Design a protein with these regions (language model features):
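NAD(P)H-binding glycine-rich loop region in Rossmannoid oxidoreductase-like domains
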Residues: 57, 63-104
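Glycine-rich NAD(P)-binding loop of the Rossmann-fold in SDR/ketoreductase-type enzymes
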Residues: 71, 100-111, 119, 148, ...
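N-terminal Rossmann NAD(P)H-binding glycine-rich loop of SDR-like oxidoreductase domains
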Residues: 15-41
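Conserved C-terminal active-site "lid" loop/helix of NAD(P)H-dependent oxidoreductases
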Residues: 57, 220, 226-243, 247, ...
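Alpha-helical substrate-binding/gating segment
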Residues: 181-187, 197-218, 226
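Conserved Rossmann-fold NAD(P)-dependent oxidoreductase catalytic core, especially the SDR/UDP-sugar
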Residues: 111-149
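Catalytic helix-loop patch of NAD(P)-dependent Rossmann-fold dehydrogenases
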Residues: 103, 137-176
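Conserved glycine-rich Rossmann-like NAD(P)H-binding loop of the short-chain dehydrogenase/reductase
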Residues: 40-57
């Protein structure tokens, strides 16, 4: 089952400047489209700052573009000036060489939070990942309060981001909702996806809920649709007012036989294909 995303941002929202990092990426584009529909229909989020390493060529009238590399601390401080809230979708999105992940996801997250502190920004919605717990066995039910079991450098970098979020809340009052996102793609592609899929409309609903909920402190939630066989807890959804509406079940007959090689870590662990990546050569 899938839902229409047209009305997925209908909750009351503030009118201040919002920043989306990683605006040129797949998830950034989904959010920008949703915000554009919201502005056209209801006049909300009139000022949207969008950022990526490369220029965007499809800017809306409501969008202000700032080209910025997450690893550039000074540039990040400029990027956050005047920003009330951040939806952080930027960074390295898949498992790869540690050095690449270090610069984008570790140095980049430090730069983001330090810039937010200096700018007085008080809310971050962080794209964390299910790969923070990707070494749990497939089928095991996992909640945010269980020990981390990252499945690679990427998962470790997202665990680092969650740690930074906690520290910057406890010391400086910057609230964060860490979204341990599942498989955010147009449709589930394999048997794993029957448990991990997060539809685009549910992703938009989740992000908006995390952005607008009051008094979240530092909260970690899993981002997944209403899949009957999902592996992850709904803990924290009630705190932000998120309800998943879509389900991967509509593709079960088509994809349930699409599995990873028997006996491989990809078939055993929740991280799936990420368990088949690496080790990587020393030079990059």
């Amino acid at each position: 089952m899938t839902s229409d995303s047209t009305n997925s941002m209908s909750a009351a929202t503030p009118s201040g400047r919002l920043l989306i990092t990683g605006a040129a990426g797949a998830l950034g584009r989904v959010l920008r489209k949703a915000w554009a529909q919201e502005i056209n229909g209801n006049g909300r989020w009139q000022h949207l700052r969008v950022s990526d390493r490369l220029p965007l060529h499809d800017l809306g009238a409501h969008e202000e573009q700032v080209i910025c590399d997450l690893s550039d601390r000074e540039a990040m401080e400029g990027l956050l000036q005047g920003v009330e809230a951040v939806v952080h979708m930027g960074g390295q999105a898949v498992e790869t060489h540690f050095e690449i992940i270090r610069d984008a996801n570790i140095q980049g997250v430090f730069n983001l939070y330090e810039a937010a502190r200096l700018a007085g920004c008080k809310r971050v919605v962080m794209a964390s990942s299910n790969h923070v717990t990707g070494c749990y066995e497939q089928g095991q039910f996992v909640s945010p309060d269980m020990p981390a079991k990252p499945d690679g450098y990427y998962g470790v970098s997202k665990l680092f981001a969650e740690g930074m979020a906690s520290m910057y809340f406890e010391r400086y009052g910057i609230e964060t909702v860490n979204l341990r996102l599942g498989s955010v793609i147009p449709k589930a592609e394999d048997r794993r996806g029957l448990s991990t899929w997060l539809s685009y409309p549910d992703f938009v609903r989740l992000t908006l809920a995390a952005l607008t909920a009051k008094d979240v402190g530092c909260l970690t939630v899993y981002g997944v649709s209403a899949n009957p066989n999902k592996w992850w807890s709904e803990a924290g959804w009630d705190k932000i007012g998120y309800q998943a509406l879509d389900s991967a079940e509509i593709w079960r007959d088509e994809i349930q036989d699409k599995v990873f090689p028997a006996g491989s870590l990809m078939a055993q662990k929740q991280g799936g294909s990420f368990l088949g990546l690496g080790p990587f050569p020393k030079s990059v």
